[in-house]
Amino acid sequence: MGSGSQQKSEKLRSKPPFSEMENFHAQYEMLGTIGHGGSTKVKLARHRLTGTHVAVKMIPKREYWCKPLMSEAELLMMADHPNIISLLQVIETKKKVYLIMELCEGKSLYQHIRNAGYLQEDEARALFKQLLSAINYCRNQGIVHRDLKPDNIMVEKDGRVKIIDFGLGIQVKPGQKLNLFCGTYPFSAPEVLLSRPYDGPKIDVWTLGVVLYFMVTGKIPFDAASIEKLRKQIVAGKYSVPCRLSVKLHHLITLLMTDNPELRPTVAEVMMHPWVTKGSGVFPDPCEEQIPLKPDPAIVKAMGHIGFQAQDIEDSLRQRKFNETMASYCLLKKQLLKECDRPIRAQPMNPSVTPFPSLVDTPTFHLGLRRRETEPTSLRLSANRQMSVCGRSTSKKRDRSFSWPGVLSRPINITPTMDQTHTCTRSVPCINSNFCIIHPNSSDESTEGHTSASAEDKPVRSRGWPRGIKGWTSKIGNAMRKLCCCIPSNETSHLGQRRVSPKK
């Protein structure tokens, strides 16, 4: 891990947690649930200003939760890679923390493989190289995911891979050993199942091997009717490889799933393997900015018409504040890029809709969507602020389970078929007596999500916003579209009409 990221991590811990409350519903409209993860939920929401769909992870704040060294939000704040899900904004209320993230328009790798049966080596290579690039970036940042699996890997329509759900992630120093045992059983490395201190990056390498095996065979390498048999298989490293696989691929899988972590290669070494570099050794550019440090003047001008200040936009991006301004800029930029990539075609005009104003038509912007000076702005959460949040990804439905004393709990029904394995292989949160005190009256809070919404979660009108917010949403959408020369001025937006896949 570089000194820069270490200093950034120290800043994250040194700052006090943010204290201001901000109403989530003033900025986002809830559309439905797209994923569950134990106590957390992932919601589909619409950004009111831009009309763009986003994914919102809702994390309850509970006193008896495990308190990890770094929260999922802090890890995502550190990450800026094209193959890692982008965090846009963080909003905290008295009971919950909202992580607003980009929405992947595609399928999980599990569903992608389920539909295809298995992938040919060329397609598997293209996806796997993106995974390697992302995990190598994480290694350089000192981040360990600890729960890589097909459910936590999204494949977008253009073939781009996105790693999601860093709920079990952690930041480590070079050579640091970990003792908290967590993850998904069939994807766990032998040293984890043996309850030994382990090297974080090496368990991600093992899991990459299991994921690659799944991609090219359509099944996981280890299957058994009981946890004990499954554990023995993984510890012994016993699995079969179809003879149709190439020699180089067979060799790579064997390297990745080396039972001795000392002999297991690093991600950088895997990236140099002949099977990986076949055809083209080009990897996704880790320097490709997902969140730009310098704003586009045209977007700044458009945002200025609706009340945003240019200096505030620049500061929010440069300091990565993850506030309303930063989220609005990133979503507007994404919307603009999407419109520019769309083929030019005439669209029928709706006679009942007033034509959108353009940026050059300045008189039409004098009633822009401006905020009052007294209105609380987005939470000023910069990349050096701390959150005491512990997001975890577990199953929506729980099977009978057994517990490792003081360590972790895992499902007991592990069966050979892919569907049943997918149902039973769920993530397990870190449970350690040193970090977690179980509240005896947790049942009341566990049912909180099934009762009526609390007052703070009910939609309220945004203060300082004029009536007709839908009209202004359309205005800013068209204003951004005017910035792209390849889009006709009379084209209507189709944002939100694409089918999206849930993320866990």
UniProtKB/Swiss-Prot annotation:
It catalyses: L-seryl-[protein] + ATP = O-phospho-L-seryl-[protein] + ADP + H(+); L-threonyl-[protein] + ATP = O-phospho-L-threonyl-[protein] + ADP + H(+). It is an enzyme of class 2 (transferase). One of its GO terms (molecular function) is protein serine/threonine kinase activity. Testis-specific. Expressed in the testis from 22 days postpartum (22 dpp). Residues 294-334 form the UBA domain. Residues 376-393, 443-454 have a biased composition (Polar residues). Residues 376-403, 443-469 are annotated as: Disordered. Residues 28-276 form the Protein kinase domain. It comes from the Eukaryota. Its EC number is 2.7.11.1. SMART domains: S_TKc. The active site is at D147. InterPro entries: Kinase-like_dom_sf, Prot_kinase_dom, Ser/Thr_kinase_AS. ATP binds at I34, G35, H36, G37, G38, S39, T40, K41, V42, K57. Pfam families: Pkinase. Keywords: ATP-binding, Kinase, Nucleotide-binding, Serine/threonine-protein kinase, Transferase. Encoded on the T-complex, a region of 20-30 Mb on proximal third of mouse chromosome 17. Naturally occurring variant forms of the T-complex, known as complete t-haplotypes, are found in wild mouse populations. The t-haplotypes contain at least four nonoverlapping inversions that suppress recombination with the wild-type chromosome, and lock into strong linkage disequilibrium loci affecting normal transmission of the chromosome, male gametogenesis and embryonic development. May play a role in sperm motility, especially in the regulation of flagellar function. Belongs to the protein kinase superfamily. CAMK Ser/Thr protein kinase family. Smok subfamily. This is Sperm motility kinase 2A. The lineage of its organism: Eukaryota, Metazoa, Chordata, Craniata, Vertebrata.
